[in-house]
Amino acid sequence: MKVVIFDMDGTVIDSGEAIYKTVNEVRDELNLPPLDKEFIIKAINEPGRNLALEFYGIDTPSRSLKEGFEEKFKKFYDECATTYEGVKELLQKCKEAHFEVVLASNAPHDTLEKILKKNEIYELFDEVIGASKEIPQKPDPAMLHLAVSKTGADKAIFIGDSLKDELAAKNANMPFLQVSWGFGDESKTATYNAKNVSEAWEIILNF
């Protein structure tokens, strides 16, 4: 049995506008000029970057800054986040082919159900896995191992858009499909690449 594991932001859900608006609203409160959207999206998808320093000039953000960011992000996420074109149909095809379908996101686990239901795709996932005290964020492979163990699958592929995703798949010894319809670009080191949903479906069918 196959399990197809999807990253969320930049792969299934387009949250770029929400992230962009949140970062720049916090910067505005700190009397800093706005940052370019492309810079923000690239920064959040690269492991090891000090985002507080790059976005706000603060080495260690205060609790109030973190809470303010989270509050703003929830607001903008609810307003702006939508599924990428064709992705709902891709999820439906996976279900129709009797593949297990799992979401593995670095977002907090307790925030995932709401956004997936809002976009009418929650019921298309057999398992939804987010970050928590027990489950570390990618590139740690824990989420991917959990997706396999929960579904009992003997073949798995992870679909994402960032280096964090690719490293998680590598750490889990799992094939990785890099998609470039969202935040990501083509990867020279990924197992597979797809520019669009049709290419992704052909790879999922045949891996």
Question: What label would you give each PLM region?
Answer:
Residues 3, 137-166:
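Conserved Lys-Pro-Asp/Glu-containing loop-to-beta segment of HAD-superfamily phosphomonoesterases
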Residues 40, 122-137:
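A short, structured active-site edge motif that brings together acidic residues
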Residues 75-103, 109, 113, 138-141:
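Short, acidic loop-to-helix structural element flanking the phosphoryl-transfer center
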Residues 96-99, 150-154, 207:
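Glycine-rich phosphate-binding loop signature in dinucleotide/nucleotide-binding domains
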Residues 157-194:
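Acidic, Mg2+-coordinating phosphoryl-transfer loop and its flanking beta/alpha structural elements
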